[in-house]
Amino acid sequence: MPTHPLCCDVRRIEGTADLLAELHCGEPGFAPYLLTAWSPVLAAWDTVILPDLARLLDEPLALRKPRTGHTASRRLTWHCAIRNTASVELNDNDWFELTREVVDVTGIGPDGDPAACRWAALSNTADGLDIVATVIREDGRWARLHNDAYCVCSACWGFAHDHGLDGSPPITGFYHSSPAGPNRGISRSSS
C-alpha cells in the first residue's frame, strides 16, 4: 500500500502550555515560527512567547464557567500534526492554504464564524506543521468536532492531489493563495 505524501495525526490532550513547550523542541538547526493564527493581530507579531500564546489560546476555557455555569472538562486542547513526506517542498503559502482548509473542515475555525475556536499553526520542522487549538469556542460552546481526524485526512488528500504531491500532475486553472506573511519567531519566555 502506498504511503500518503501528507501524514497527519489528530489528538486531544489536557495542557496547551505543555504541548507548545513539547512542540518547540523541534528539528535541530530549525528555528520554529508562528505561521498563522485565528487572530491576524497575533499572526503579525514579530516574536511569540509560548506561555503568552498558551494563555491566549486557553482564554475561552477560563471564560466558560462564568458564561455557561459549567466547568470545562479535560482534554480540551486539540493538536493536529501534519508532515510532508513528498519530495516536493511546501512553502509558507502552501502550509497557510492547508491550515485554513483543515481548521475550516474540522469545525475548529469555519470561515466566517466570529465565535470559532482559537487556533495557531506553528512550523516546528522544515517538513511539517502543527495546529494547536482549544475545543471551546469564543462563545463558550463546544466545537462540533465530529470525525475531525477523517476531515483532516480528507483535506490532506485533496491538497496533495491538487498540488501534485501524490504523483499526479497538479490541477491547473485558477489558483488563489492567501498571503501567509513573513516567518515569525517563537520564544519560550520573555526573559
Model-predicted regions and their roles:
Residues 1-191:
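N-terminal nicking endonuclease/strand-transfer module with a His-rich metal-binding environment
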